[in-house]
């Protein structure tokens, strides 16, 4: 009887510790993400709340990234699957993903498909020399490295950044989204292309080329 009691107690304690640990997997609302504007912060923490309510779970495939990933909705319907989890956040930066990797590391998914980086170039980076292809690519690879270090069995795939439609970009600017550059510069696509070239030469992770 005593042995059974001790066994039940141990399992109860392990369960409590596991639940306690889970509460620390997500960035809190006071987390500062460099360059994040108010609308982005709102979207970011709304999604974080959703993630808390619907954890990744075990043996999953995670689609991690920005609005392109989020916009896919339930990716399971598209791929006739039942184990894909959407972890896209509209307007997110590489810095935002770096702040929310604990959940990925904890659940150790089978694979992660990563698409991020375009929002850095959308933002007005004329006075932010750190926002350049080299550093954006460096952050993307850093995300992959952190996942691999703490979850070595997780296979990480990196999507190349998609270019923008110049005409559509100008139309969107007219709506006065503050996160877009004040002075339109057609160099966004050249920065995207350069970033993709760096990623494709990384030698550590498979790169899925969505646009050569």
Predicted regions and their residues:
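N-terminal secretory targeting modules
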Residues: 1-63
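Short amphipathic alpha-helices and their capping/turn segments at secondary-structure boundaries
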Residues: 49-61, 98-107, 144-149
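Catalytic nucleophile-elbow at a beta strand-turn-alpha helix junction centered on a G-D-S/GDSL motif
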Residues: 58-74, 90-92
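Structural recognition of the beta-strand scaffold that forms the well-ordered cores
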Residues: 61-63, 85-88, 111-115, 155-160, ...
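Oxyanion-hole/transition-state-stabilizing segment in secreted/luminal serine hydrolases
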Residues: 70-83, 94-138, 146, 157, ...
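Residue-level preference for long, well-ordered alpha-helices that form the structural scaffold
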Residues: 93, 129-136, 181-192
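A general structural detector for well-ordered alpha-helical segments in enzyme core domains, enriched
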Residues: 100, 136-147, 188-199
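Substrate-gating cap/lid alpha-helix
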Residues: 166-210
